[in-house]
Amino acid sequence: MNYSKRTAGALRVIGGKYRSRLLRVSARPGLRPTPDRVRETLFNWLGQDLSGLACLDLFAGSGALGFEAASRGAMRVVMVEKDRAAAAQLERNRAALDATQVTIVRGDAAAFLARDYERPGARPSGRFDVVFLDPPFRQNAVPAMLGKLPPRLQPNARVYVESDVPVEVAAPWAELE
């Protein structure tokens, strides 16, 4: 598949409260919504019930992973997206689902990790149990993001990484699958 082409249309939430609901996807260069099969495998690994967990979707793009987490009961989902049009589409999808546990942050992922954008009433620590790290391909952003994540993670947090190049996993990280 040529990921450099624009992707537009819709994708479906595959499980949980919002199952079968459509998420509109903006036509943006490099936007790669995570395919159904990959999301299904990922959420089989994470578990179907994410109740009580805080999730961070860096480089949210279509929001497929963050909305899937919200659908499966995550108490808080923060989606960070730099692209103005993609972030606006995330807001429209959040409103259409009435996903009040989802917060959209339009901004740079590295800046988000460096500052505290948390909304009032969120966990004071601003830490996350699950992080989805799926930056645009050919940006080699994964190593830098992994270096900035530890202060924002709960003990035993899980980080899902999607990359177009192999990622070296070094301490304090452990590769699970």
Predicted regions: what they are:
Residues M1-E177:
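Class I S-adenosyl-L-methionine-dependent methyltransferase catalytic core
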